[in-house]
């Protein structure tokens, strides 16, 4: 079902256990970022847990835990996803929290600066100080020509030192909207009732005009092999990756 404000809702009943999984997918990721602003989407994912006008910083995770649930999030090249696993009876409370932060995010400059230190350390641990992280980053740089496809999801270190809190606020204001999201719910729920609950909680959030996304299919096809070699001081063990460029799934975004 699609609400008047553009939010697409998918509900799948599964009554094998009294639990439910909620996922909200935002159609925004590293492919949408401009050169010099890499890591925007991933940084905003971190800040989405820093509170709203009604839910203080850190309270989101505490409330999910209090309900006996688990939650997390991830950022990819094409999407940013937030998900929770809870007792089915507590699903409405989870949806209320997600609806709130879809349009009421409110973080301070101080929280932003603190979190950027965390993100820079995350990059050091996952990319700078690991051979496989460095290998995959170099593989994308070699395989693609468009900056949007080459960019690191977590962001390049130089960009992580120059991103501003207002960059993230503008990103949030533009892309976190019901008409740029898909809500997926699977579990021990009644589909009709769940759709009604979601419509009540998300239905009044206004839609926002969305700019066209980067056209990934315009990436030129390479008909010759590309080889890249890199060294890393953290290991003497050789790592090898063989990657193949394959055709896209036609209109996958439209299908979703």
Please report, for each region that a protein language model flagged, where it lies by residue.
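Non-catalytic beta-strand/loop surface segments
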Residues: 1-30, 54-90, 126-180, 204-251
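Short pre-active-site segment immediately N-terminal to the catalytic Zn-binding motif
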Residues: 29-38
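Hydrophobic face of alpha-helices
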Residues: 41, 57, 61, 95, ...
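Bacterial peptidoglycan biogenesis and beta-lactam-recognition machinery
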Residues: 49-53, 103, 107-108, 190-192, ...
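M16/insulysin-pitrilysin zinc metalloprotease superfamily fold
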Residues: 51-54, 85-116, 251-254
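Non-catalytic accessory/assembly modules
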Residues: 110-117, 124, 130-138, 185, ...
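Non-catalytic, conformational "gating/processing" segments within enzyme and secreted inhibitor domains
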Residues: 116, 165-201
